[in-house]
Amino acid sequence: MDQPHPPENAETSIGGAPNGFIVEIPTLKSLFIEMCFGETVLGTGTAFLVSNNRESHCALVTNRHNLTGRHQETGKCLSNTGGVPDNIVIHFHKNNDFIGEWLPVRLPLYRSDGSPYWFEHSKLEENADVVALNLSWGGDVRKVPYYLETELDRFGIAIGPAEPVSVIGFPFGYSSTARFPIWATGFLAQELSLITPENPTFLVDCRTRQGQSGSPVLAYRVGNYRKIDGDKLSSVLSPTPIWEFLGIYSGRLNSESDIGRVWHASAVADVLAVATADALRREQKAEGHV
């Protein structure tokens, strides 16, 4: 049994009295969102930030159906008011030394010409229930993204069917405390090797409900876990928690079942790349390069 080297930024929790709550880093990464028409809240959900690494572009990711306000497959309006959102309120962590304070930021979802601000999958487009939003960052919010290309969030944990996975979000808009998310834990319901570029999704067996759409899905391990290192598989005993970002939860297959669909991390990476390319084009245009 191997002893692991710590991943980049081996801290796994943050905060503490008198500077707020002590929470695991993944707890900080799930953000409560409200989908609104004007000032009217139509529904709630979950979002999170993603970036490839600490120096690269950062974007907000959630489910497409959260922003359209319509069922991803049927197109049916999700709100019993019959309304669809035209803006979103994101509850960011305040950028101070106190963990446990939030700053709600309201952002429009559509430009003046009616086109959406969000970015869709480069190949699957509107058929993928994952989108990204570019934001203008100020110093008043704390950015705690999932890093898609570092060992902090992608440690190389080997995960098979029936192993635990966690969906970290806000079922029915509920929180554990204040605006901290709830960890709902279930099991991987298939082999990840069955994921294809044409259908970058996998199934989990987890008791989830509305409001958890857009939640990050993790394999979170304390103690023993299996690690992939090239073509080798080893058993590792870790003194600190380790986690693997797997993807974004998008909802149950059937209202009477606990089987839910997750869009794989590769789909999240795709919409991040689309958002990053647009941000770069706008930056170059502003500088007069194009």
Regions from the language model: what does each represent?
Residues 40-59, 259:
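A conserved glycine-rich beta-strand in the N-terminal activation segment of trypsin-fold
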Residues 1-19:
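N-terminal targeting leaders that route proteins to membranes or the secretory/organellar pathways
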Residues 63-66, 169, 247-254:
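Short beta->alpha transition motifs characteristic of CBS
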Residues 50-52, 191, 220, 251:
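Residue-level recognition of beta-strand microenvironments
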Residues 6-7, 23-26, 219-290:
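C-terminal subregion of chymotrypsin/trypsin-like serine protease catalytic domains
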Residues 43-45, 60, 184, 245-246:
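Structural detector for hydrophobic anchor residues on beta-strands
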Residues 28-31, 43-44, 76, 80-199, ...:
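Serine endopeptidase catalytic core focused on the charge-relay Asp
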Residues 20-25, 50:
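Long protein-protein interaction modules used by eukaryotic assembly/scaffold proteins
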